[in-house]
Amino acid sequence: MAVLMFRTVIAFGCIFCANVSANDVYFDQAWLRETPQEHSSVAIYGRLINKSEGFEFLELVTSEQANLVMLHRSVKQQGMIGMVHIESVQIAPGETAYFEPAGMHMMATGLRGRLVEGDCLKLSLQFRSGKAIKARAIVGSVSQMEFPRKKESCLE
């Protein structure tokens, strides 16, 4: 009986592990800038990679550390840089969508605390297909312009 229970636990454990490792959509090199004391919003950057055989549509991003996370694109209108809200991000099979300064990004508003260099912002990304992934974005310096290359504890 004990051997049967052991085999059952191992079998279910392996099924769970296979589902976790079979994830074919990734959000990596996620980062954001440190927030000044008086700011309650921040742009989030990174790479959304689709290694699946079908199109994926990112439709919702949430964080326990913010009231709202929206998808935006920076646009230049009448000589001024502004942002427009986008409903979803389409990623073709084998393609990568880049979230970067002066381009497409996620905007977290209503932050529930100041984020300082080395902190992490936890994100949940949900897709039209029903897939959902978790990610962590590392907080860089106020002047950061790209993913911080040094290894930080929250990403380990």
Label each residue range with its predicted role.
Residues F12-I15, E152:
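Secreted/extracellular small peptides and ectodomain modules produced from precursors
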Residues N23-E156:
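Compact, glycine-rich, soluble single-domain proteins
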Residues C17-A22:
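N-terminal signal peptide c-region/cleavage motif recognized by signal peptidases
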Residues A2-A11:
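Sec-dependent signal peptide recognition
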